[in-house]
Regions:
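A detector for short, charged/polar N-terminal pre-domain segments
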Residues: 1-9
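Short amphipathic helical patch at the helix-1/turn junction of helix-turn-helix
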Residues: 8, 19-20, 48
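Short basic helix-loop element that most often maps to the first helix and adjoining turn
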Residues: 12-29, 56, 89-92
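Recognition helix of helix-turn-helix/homeodomain-like DNA-binding domains
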Residues: 33-48, 70
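DNA major-groove recognition helix of helix-turn-helix/homeodomain DNA-binding modules
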Residues: 52-67
């Protein structure tokens, strides 16, 4: 995918999320500590942004930078859990998995 198309897609995601939150460009600019002109350019896909501005925008919109860049939704709770699992031994991970499977069974889900 070329850069211009990526920027346009990212801009579309920013605009959709902003509107979904009921924010104006001005309100998003204030919330993200960026200028209204910057938000406008970002939404139009006319400009890329530095990583620190991408992070500000994502935080203000309550989404991950991955979502803005690619459209992939990463639930922050799942990401946090994943980081915690990385600190466990393989045996401990299997134990956590069995506990999760039991919870799924108890609450009507399928045993994965």
């Amino acid at each position: 995918m070329d850069v211009e198309l990526c920027l346009k897609e990212m801009g579309r995601r920013i605009m959709e999320r902003r509107k979904g939150m009921g924010l104006t460009q001005e309100a998003l600019a204030e919330k993200s500590d960026l200028t209204t002109q910057f938000v406008s350019y970002a939404e139009s896909g006319k400009r890329g942004m530095r990583p620190e501005n991408l992070m500000k925008m994502a935080e203000a919109l309550g989404v991950s930078t991955d979502y803005l860049l690619t459209g992939d939704i990463i639930d922050k709770d799942k990401l946090l859990l994943s980081h915690k699992l990385d600190r466990l031994t393989p045996r401990q991970v299997r134990l956590v998995e069995s506990i999760v499977d039991e919870c799924i069974l108890l609450y009507g889900g399928e045993n994965l």
